[in-house]
Structures are given as C-alpha cells and as structure tokens.
C-alpha cells in the first residue's frame, strides 16, 4: 500500500517523467515511406509479452476493425518562421504564434533581447517589396514580442498568405539535417492537412500514407477530421516540479456536429474510438461537457490538462510518437496506461533502437491496454 501511495505521489512530480535517451535515436528525417515507420503495439498494460515491437505502421490495418472510428487532426503547419532585419542589418528570426488584436501578432524572437519596443524591422524577400514591421510590446508569459504587421494582416487567412510568401516551416530544434526546405514542406505535413494554423505538426499523423488511409476506409474503418491548431505550448518545457495544479497552454479546437454525432453512435456499440495523436485526444476529450454529461460540438480555445488520474470520456485507443522527457505529451500518454508502464515501454523502445520524437517511430496503445476506469 505504501509503495502504491508513493507511486501515485510521484505521478505528480515532473522529475518522475524523465528518462535517458541516446541522441543517435532522435530522428532527423522521417521514414522514406510513411507507413513503413516502425510500430510498437501495446495490447495489455500488465503483460510484457503483449508488447509487440516487430511491426510497422501499415500493420494498423490489422488492428483497426470495421466500424471503428479513427479521428485525425487536419491542422496544417504554417510557414511561421520569418527572418527580419533591423535598421543596422542585424538578422532576427520570428516565430509567429497567434493574433493578439487588430494587426498585432504575438511572436517568439531570436535573439529577443534585440527587439526593444518601437524598434523597426524589415521583412525582406526577393519575391516582393520589403515589408515594414514594428515591435509593439513584450509578452511576459512567453518572453515573446507583440509585432505590428501591415494593417491588412488581421486574421489567420491573411497572415497565412503572407507566411506562404515569406516564411519557412518551423522545425523543432532537434531536427538537424541538410534537407532542402521543400522536403520539410511536404514531409512535416500530414497527408490530410487542410486547415492552416499550427506552428508544429501533429506528428502521429505523419505515419499515415494515402494508401494506408485508403485501405482502412476500404476495410470499413470510419475516418473523420477534427482541428486542433498545435501551438507553442506543445513544445514549451513544463516549468513547475509540482504537477498537482498544472496549467497548460490554450489551443484552438474545432469538433463539428458530424463528429459528435458519430461519437455518440459509436459509444452505443462495441466499436472503438481511436485518436491519431495526442492533439486529437485533447480535442476529443474537450468536447465532453461535464455540465450536461454529454458530447457537444465546439469551436474555441481549450486548456484541458490530461495527466495521471484523468478519466477518459471519448478516446479508447491512441497512435502516438515517442515523446520528449518531462513533456505534457508524456503526461497525457501516462494517463492512459500508467507512468511506470510507459517508461518501461520507453526503455524497451530504446533498447530496440526505435527512433524518437517528431520524425520518429510510433506506438499504438490499443483499447485493451488502457488503465481500468476507477
């Protein structure tokens, strides 16, 4: 009993989600064929022999059943990284995060210390005339800068048009290779990315090729999209050791009526709801209303925290990548199968040379592997 209590207490300590990883296992490029990435299949939380490590993403065709509902995140990564020039020709990099008001946008800056309030910037491109920007303020929460863009850049659509002309895909810092920008523009997007607004990819979806999606549909698997625009908070380190009162970033989520009605229908059958990626989990669980004890369509910012002790209302299974230590994504997956079990699986993955992080391999947490609801 004492051991169990200690383990539960550790579930709320950030250091309990740390692990050692050989840097050589951090993937710098994706599998040449999306569905040929390696796949760890977790079937039962307590039986080691039920963890399969000799599979590939294409084997999901054998895992999903006719009538199962698979939810994908159709967000599209914006070319949100901009290179700007100060009056003295010093180059600064901006990462556009979100609109604040009017034509003012919150951006991370590197190096930020050079961007004092009222400092003038110039967005340079060989494709068009220079665009003038101004530092409008400092954001205390992120350390970012509020940047005033031209007066017509007042919505996501107009910003995305500008970024398509001037920007670059904002890759995570651990992806270091010499590939051309055009390579990442394709490989760092899912095959079904249609809704621009993310600053990072929903990476579990990178494993789904067009042919795998087609074969799943032919089998009778229902595939529907939701939208969660992956924000800066997804890769922002957790800065508190005590997780009992953890607060996380807000992200824009849209789950439409069709998806909600399908969730309600599936819940009355023996079929399962499988989320492709942790972003899909966060979106789906956010559409459950505790006030009316039912699922509702949503289109709003959500700040749902999923950590050990959370009771899942929607999701039965999950396809996910291998995540960074001490990350909110690790907390979410731990809520599904338990922290100790997850870290044991990560040790196994490291031993068997699985590739980690955004361009890495995948883990499928099957419905029978989830912790029993209390």
UniProtKB/Swiss-Prot annotation:
InterPro entries hit by this protein: QueA, QueA_dom1, QueA_dom2, QueA_sf
Main location: cytoplasm
Catalyzed chemical reaction(s): 7-aminomethyl-7-carbaguanosine(34) in tRNA + S-adenosyl-L-methionine = epoxyqueuosine(34) in tRNA + adenine + L-methionine + 2 H(+)
Keywords associated with the record: Cytoplasm, Queuosine biosynthesis, S-adenosyl-L-methionine, Transferase
Pathway(s) of this molecule: tRNA modification; tRNA-queuosine biosynthesis
E.C. number(s) listed in UniProt: 2.4.99.17
Record family assignment: Belongs to the QueA family.
HAMAP family registered for this protein in UniProt: QueA
Quaternary structure (record): Monomer.
Protein's name according to its UniProt entry: S-adenosylmethionine:tRNA ribosyltransferase-isomerase
Species the sequence originates in: Prochlorococcus marinus (strain MIT 9301)
């Amino acid at each position: 009993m004492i051991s169990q209590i200690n383990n539960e207490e550790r579930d709320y300590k950030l250091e309990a989600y740390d692990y050692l990883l050989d840097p050589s296992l951090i993937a710098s490029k994706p599998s040449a064929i999306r569905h040929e990435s390696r796949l760890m299949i977790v079937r039962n939380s307590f039986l080691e022999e039920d963890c399969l490590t000799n599979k590939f993403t294409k084997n999901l065709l054998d895992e999903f059943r006719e009538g199962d509902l698979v939810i994908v995140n159709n967000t599209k990564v914006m070319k949100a990284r901009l290179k700007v020039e100060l009056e003295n020709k010093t180059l600064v990099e901006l990462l556009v995060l979100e609109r604040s008001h009017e034509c003012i946008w919150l951006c991370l800056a590197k190096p930020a210390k050079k961007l004092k309030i009222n400092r003038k910037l110039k967005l340079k491109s060989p494709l068009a005339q220079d665009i003038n920007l101004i530092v409008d303020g400092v954001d205390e929460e992120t350390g970012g800068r509020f940047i005033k863009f031209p007066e017509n850049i007042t919505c996501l659509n107009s910003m995305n048009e500008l970024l398509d002309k001037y920007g670059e895909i904002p890759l995570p810092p651990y992806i270091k290779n010499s590939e051309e920008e055009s390579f990442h523009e394709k490989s760092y997007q899912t095959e079904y990315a249609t809704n621009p607004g993310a600053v990072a990819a929903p990476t579990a979806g990178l494993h789904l090729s067009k042919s795998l999606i087609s074969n799943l549909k032919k089998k009778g698997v229902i595939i529907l999209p939701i939208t969660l625009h992956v924000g800066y908070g997804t890769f922002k380190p957790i800065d508190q050791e005590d997780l009992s009162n953890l607060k996380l970033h807000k992200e824009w989520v849209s789950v439409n009526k069709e998806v909600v009605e399908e969730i309600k229908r599936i819940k009355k059958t023996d079929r399962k709801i499988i989320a492709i990626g942790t972003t899909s989990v966060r979106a789906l669980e956010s559409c459950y209303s505790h006030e009316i004890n039912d699922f509702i369509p949503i289109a709003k910012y959500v700040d749902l925290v999923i950590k050990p002790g959370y009771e899942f209302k929607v999701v039965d299974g999950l396809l996910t990548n291998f995540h960074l230590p001490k990350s909110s994504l690790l907390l979410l997956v731990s809520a599904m199968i338990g922290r100790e079990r997850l870290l044991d699986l990560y040790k196994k993955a490291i031993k068997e040379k699985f590739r980690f992080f955004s361009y890495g391999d995948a883990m499928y947490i099957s419905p029978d592997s989830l912790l029993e609801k209390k």
